[in-house]
């Protein structure tokens, strides 16, 4: 099982291609169901547009369906690629431990981009491709929570110390957002972000 951690608009889809996983890996991602189901019910993929209550309830059902789908494939010992923003870190830790316990090898990959980059990517994804738009407020909330979990509390590195877990990116790459000030660090080299994608260079 491979987990890819990253906030909305961080480039997780791009990283999936970079990792070059075999085609038999099954992607577990609620947002893919959202993009398939919402239009069937006449619901906009722009999460800022109403009806909010209907969208929230439908998304909860899709999250449950995704969890059930994952259980089904785990029972069949299928290889999985789990795409997650990583904000519910305790739940992720429980899932990782459960997978290792039943015999899975687990690998983790984390992406760290500044919240402003996440917001920009989310906006461009909607404007250029018509794909889902989370919106700047929620995107920033998710990005800030991700920074707290992954960067400040070093949960990603802690997970890497668990039995049966391998880190595919073994450094916090790079710590470009200062969670204390809410600003991009002055020493951040913006050249690591090119062509609206995250280029994985050595810090």
Question: Could you tell me what each predicted segment is?
Answer:
Residues 7-8:
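The conserved Walker
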Residues 13-76, 90:
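Conserved substrate/cofactor phosphate-moiety recognition/catalytic segment
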Residues 44-47, 99, 125-128:
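Short, hinge-like loop/turn segments at secondary-structure boundaries
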Residues 76-81, 105:
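Loop/turn-to-beta-strand initiation segments
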Residues 82-92, 115:
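Acidic, metal-coordinating catalytic cores used for nucleic-acid/nucleotide bond scission
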Residues 100-122:
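Conserved phosphate-donor/acceptor-positioning beta-strand/loop module used by diverse small-molecule
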Residues 117-203:
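Conserved GTP-binding G-domain of TRAFAC-class P-loop NTPases and closely related GTPase folds
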